[in-house]
Amino acid sequence: MAPAKSTKKPGSAPYPAKIIRPEEGNIAGIYSAIQGEGTLVGERQMFIRFGGCPFRCHYCDTPEALVPAQVCRIEDPPGSRKFRRVANPVAPPVLEGAVRPFLSPDSHHRSVVLTGGEPLWQAAYLRNALPAVRAFGRKVYLETAGTHVDELKSVLELIDVVAMDMKPPSSTGMKPLWAQHREFLKVALPKQVMVKVVVTRSTSLPDLEQVRDIVSEVDRTIAVVLQPLTPAWKARKIPTPAQLFMWQGLLSEKLENVRVIPQCHKLLGDI
C-alpha cells in the first residue's frame, strides 16, 4: 500500500479518522514476528496492527497504518508470510477467531502486541475485544504514542506491558507533547512500562533533557530506549555514534536504565 498523504502540517490538529463503532475495529494486519524494538527485543510475539493515527511523525516507518485500512491482512499460517484478507471493520468474534491459531500452546508466542497506527484511538473496541484475547493466557503488550491518557485509563486493567513513545519535536517535526507524556507515564506506572525515544541527527539536547526529567520525576528506574532512526518517510539522517554515546550519558545522569537499541527487525528484513 502506498504511503498515506496527509493534508495536515506536522503538529497540527489530529488527522480525522473514519468513525468506528465500539463493537467494530479497524485492523490493518495480524501476524507473527520477532520483536525488534525496546527491552523485549528478540521475543516471538503476535502482532495486531491497528489502522489510523493522529500523528504524522517525520520518522514514521509504517505510513500505511496512518489511516484506516480497507482490509485486514491475516497471516495464515502463522510465520509463513502468506496472508488472507478480511474486510474491515473487524468485530470482536472475528478477531478472536483470527488470533486463535497464533496462541495455541505450541505457537511459542510470548505475548500479544497491540501496535499501529495508534491502538488507543480504538479504546472502546479494545474494551470489548481484549477479554477474549486475554483468555488465551498471553500477556498483552501495548505500543502507543503515549498521549491518550483517558483512553489508557479505560483499558489499563486489560494491559500487562506499556511501551510508550516520547516524541521530541526535534525528531518528529511536530509540536511538543511533554504534558501529555508526563500524565500518560504516571497512569501507566502500575504496569510494566518502558519508554522509547526515536532519535535522529537533529534531535536536540533540550528535548532529551525533557525526556530525562519527566521520566526521573515519575520513576528513575523505568527503562528508556534511545532508538536510532531507521531512514524513513521524511527523516533520513541517522545520529552518529558519538551523539548516541553522549545522549545515553545525558539521560543516565538521572535514570538507571538507559539503552541504545536500533530496530532489529529492520536488520533482519522482517515486517
Whereabouts are the PLM-identified features?
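Flexible mid-to-C-terminal extensions adjoining Fe-S/redox cofactors in radical SAM and related proteins
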Residues: A2-P3, F50
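Short, basic/aromatic-enriched C-terminal tail that caps enzymatic domains
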Residues: P3, P14-Y31, E256-I271
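Conserved Radical SAM active-site core
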Residues: P3-P14, G25, Y59-L158
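Intrinsically disordered, low-complexity boundary segments flanking structured domains
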Residues: A13-K18, Q35, D213, M246-L250
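N-terminal pre-triad scaffold of radical SAM enzymes
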Residues: R21-L66
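Conserved Rossmann-like nucleotide-binding pocket used by diverse enzymes
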Residues: R49, T115, V225
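Conserved AdoMet/S-adenosylmethionine-binding subsite of the radical SAM
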Residues: H108-S111, P119-I271
